[in-house]
């Protein structure tokens, strides 16, 4: 059966994001993925030493100064017969709620682990978010050109800490100065390592068969024997790859390599296009929308301010769920009920914007936005429904914000509410006093907010520390119990930017005790937009 041209386009799409701890090599992998997809011919070392060459996926003034990717940019590139959309996720200590929300807009994730360090804190947090939708995960063990931990130990750690089974696809031969290549368990082939730096992809020498004498000649008898011994262990002790379990988010195929040395990234990409799902169906408040439907639907998962320093515009990033976008099409913004003609949607190659004529499910569009679009907004061709699963996440860091000029309270509140609608930060107004508390997931969000308040709203603000450890959105089906809860905890209650009631806890101990005391009240870590 031949698929219609529309369904062929849908079937070609793969949309994924990379999750990792800072410095596990995410930006390098991003560049090498684009290199193998021929999207950029020179993958510049990320912080070009002494040169002004910036990595392709870093932008905005602050990013330029710090050499980090604050903004979740989007890159599209062809690979084999597929079109791959890679959503970049801010990686440093400077990551934000955008990073979490971006994971709600993809169909698959690549987890990058520094093989010298293993599972680290940020990776754990990001994996928790992927669990909200059981997103399929591929794993790349990076930095094999350095001395790494025992590979079996790494697999055990992923399984135990992240509660996902590991199915090794390739297996390393040596590491550091002795790194010789990887063996592919399912193709019975060894790929020999020759370092390719920058944008040179070396021709890889392949040795067929595990017992081929050429293998001993190429890597040395000791390493060849060690490989055979390890593989016996691996095949006995680890999971076989099973596509169904992968799609259910229960096992992860594991690849080994070095992104810096341009080695192993293509094996992972081959796996990604072969196994990662084409655009998936998504839930709305009324029904499930399939990617095969021809009527257009999409949702906004992120709003980016000021991508163009010359203009103060904002761009809303929209994930296409179904249907084909065509230039000049009329779409309904469900929240406002208004119909808008969209003739200037953008597609991105990180920072280079170009206007797009058409887009399909899995693609990401940039919509110009002058403050009228919010995170979580659904666009359709008229159907009144709202996509679910684009949450706010409970902040982990809090500051009180204070004005240098107290007469500008009105501008401050307006600025903060707009910034919170964009997802730059969350705002809480305690019920019992006139404080304004801002909450964030990453420290850099605080700097961004003060800088933007000054440049966009002409408001100078400073931060003070505040006695808040965490926040939870509260609700209850029992009105009487809820009233009692509100009465007795007034000093810990606040309203967020959307006027939702929030419990702000001074300590985790306080939160746990309060939850025990009020079993009829729900304390939520996430809130739907």
UniProtKB/Swiss-Prot annotation:
GO MF term (any one): GTP binding
Signal peptide from the UniProt entry: none
Function statement: Increases the formation of ribosomal termination complexes and stimulates activities of RF-1 and RF-2. It binds guanine nucleotides and has strong preference for UGA stop codons. It may interact directly with the ribosome. The stimulation of RF-1 and RF-2 is significantly reduced by GTP and GDP, but not by GMP.
Record gene name: prfC
Protein location: Cytoplasm
Main location: cytoplasm
NCBIfam families, alphabetized: prfC (TIGR00503), PRK00741.1 (NF001964), small_GTP (TIGR00231)
Domain tr-type G: 11-280
The family this protein is said to belong to: Belongs to the TRAFAC class translation factor GTPase superfamily. Classic translation factor GTPase family. PrfC subfamily.
The protein, known as: Peptide chain release factor 3
Pfam families membership: EF-G_D2, GTP_EFTU, RF3_C
GO cellular component term of the entry, any: cytosol
Biological process annotations from GO: regulation of translational termination; translational termination
Binding of GTP, residues: 20-27, 88-92, 142-145
UniProtKB keywords: Cytoplasm, GTP-binding, Nucleotide-binding, Protein biosynthesis
Keyword Nucleotide-binding applies: yes
Organism, scientific name: Salmonella typhimurium (strain LT2 / SGSC1412 / ATCC 700720)
């Amino acid at each position: 059966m031949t698929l219609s041209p529309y369904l062929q386009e849908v079937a070609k799409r793969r949309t994924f994001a990379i999750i990792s701890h800072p410095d596990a090599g995410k930006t390098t992998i991003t560049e090498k993925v684009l290199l193998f997809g021929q999207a950029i011919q020179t993958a510049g070392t990320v912080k070009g030493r002494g040169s002004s060459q910036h990595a392709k996926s870093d932008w905005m003034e602050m990013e330029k100064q710090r050499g980090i990717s604050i903004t979740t940019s989007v890159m599209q590139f062809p690979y084999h017969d597929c079109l791959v959309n890679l959503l970049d996720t801010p990686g440093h200590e400077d990551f934000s709620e955008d990073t979490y929300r971006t994971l709600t807009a993809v169909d698959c994730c690549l987890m990058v682990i520094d093989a010298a360090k293993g599972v680290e804190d940020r990776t754990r947090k990001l994996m928790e978010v992927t669990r909200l939708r059981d997103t399929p995960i591929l794993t790349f063990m990076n930095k094999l050109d350095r001395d790494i931990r025992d590979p079996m130990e790494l697999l055990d750690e992923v399984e135990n800490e992240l509660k996902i089974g590991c199915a090794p696809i390739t297996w390393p031969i040596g590491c550091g100065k002795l790194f010789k290549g990887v063996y592919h368990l399912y193709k019975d082939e060894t790929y020999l390592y020759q370092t390719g730096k920058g944008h040179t992809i070396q021709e890889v020498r392949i040795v067929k068969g595990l017992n081929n004498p050429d293998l001993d000649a190429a890597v040395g008898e000791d390493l060849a024997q060690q490989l055979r011994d390890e593989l016996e262990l691996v095949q006995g002790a680890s999971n076989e790859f099973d596509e169904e379990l992968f799609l259910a988010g229960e096992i992860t195929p594991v690849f080994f390599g070095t992104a810096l040395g341009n080695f192993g990234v293509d094996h992972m990409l081959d796996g990604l296009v072969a196994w990662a799902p084409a655009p998936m169906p998504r839930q709305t408040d009324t029904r499930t929308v399939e990617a095969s439907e021809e009527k257009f639907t999409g949702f906004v998962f992120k709003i980016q301010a000021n991508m163009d320093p010359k203009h103060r515009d904002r761009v809303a990033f929209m994930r296409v769920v179904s249907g084909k976008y065509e230039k000049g099409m009329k779409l309904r913004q469900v929240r406002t009920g208004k119909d808008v003609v969209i003739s200037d949607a953008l597609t991105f190659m990180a920072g280079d914007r170009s206007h797009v004529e058409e887009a399909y499910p899995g693609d990401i569009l940039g919509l110009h936005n002058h403050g009228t679009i919010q995170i979580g907004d659904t666009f359709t061709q008229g159907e009144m429904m709202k996509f679910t699963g684009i949450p706010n996440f409970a902040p982990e860091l809090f500051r009180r914000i204070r004005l240098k000029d107290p007469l500008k309270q009105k501008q401050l509140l307006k600025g903060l509410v707009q910034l919170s609608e964009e997802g730059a930060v969350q705002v809480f107004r305690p019920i019992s006093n006139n404080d304004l508390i801002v909450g964030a997931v990453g420290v850099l969000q605080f700097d961004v907010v003060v800088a933007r308040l000054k440049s966009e709203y002409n408001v100078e603000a400073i931060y003070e520390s505040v006695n808040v450890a965490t926040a939870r959105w509260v609700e209850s089906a029992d009105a009487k119990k809820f009233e009692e809860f509100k009465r007795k905890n007034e000093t810990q209650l606040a309203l967020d930017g959307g006027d939702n009631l929030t419990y702000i806890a001074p300590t985790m101990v306080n939160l746990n005790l309060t939850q025990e005391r009020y079993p009829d009240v729900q304390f939520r870590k996430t809130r739907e937009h």
